[in-house]
A protein has these predicted regions:
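Catalytic core of Fe(II)/2-oxoglutarate
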Residues: 162
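Conserved short histidine dyad/triad with adjacent acidic residue
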Residues: 126, 142-157
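Fe(II)/2-oxoglutarate
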Residues: 1-34
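A structural signal for short hydrophobic/aromatic patches embedded in well-ordered alpha helices
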Residues: 28, 36, 51-53
Length: 162
């Protein structure tokens, strides 16, 4: 494993979640395999969480808001199926979003996303040889905003894991 990044050590609760520890990584992978989900409460320390919350609020004015409908598979309506078929059932997404290029360069979100140790941890937990950064300059990191009566409609993600 790479040497621990001091900035990452100040972002993540390493005492509780030693993401560079072989035994911990194996425990996480086992839990994900058994339960289909891995939950790490308080993974990001409180100070960082507060900082990220303030940062998100300060940048909310940059958000693009949109309302759309989609099915749970995020695919087009299948005209071969009846309109009331579950595949064609439409849910609503009405939210705001800022994209990677709108997130401050010094954001700890970018530090986490770019961390080799964090990527190695995730790769091992999800049983991938290596994870790569998403090269889309807008979609690698997003902050979603939902005001009252706005929502992100339920859907299956397009990626293997989220």
């Amino acid at each position: 494993m790479p040497e621990l990044d001091l900035e990452l050590e100040q972002i993540i609760n390493f005492r509780q979640y030693p993401i560079d520890n072989e035994v911990f990584i194996e425990q996480c992978a086992t839990e994900l395999d058994k339960k289909g989900v891995l939950t790490l409460p308080n993974f990001i320390n409180n100070e960082t969480l507060l900082e990220l919350t303030i940062e998100a609020k300060e940048n909310q004015f940059k958000a693009y808001y949109a309302k759309s409908t989609h099915n749970i598979y995020l695919t087009e309506i299948d005209t071969k199926l009846p309109p009331d078929h579950i595949f064609n059932y439409q849910v609503i997404s009405s939210k705001g979003c800022i994209t990677t290029d709108q997130i401050p360069e010094n954001s700890k979100l970018k530090s986490i996303y770019g961390s080799i140790i964090f990527k190695d941890f995730l790769a091992r937990v999800v049983n991938e040889r290596k994870l790569y950064e998403y090269t889309d300059p807008f979609s690698s990191i997003n902050i979603h905003y939902a005001k009252e009566n706005q929502e992100l409609g339920w859907h299956f993600d397009n990626s293997n894991f989220a």
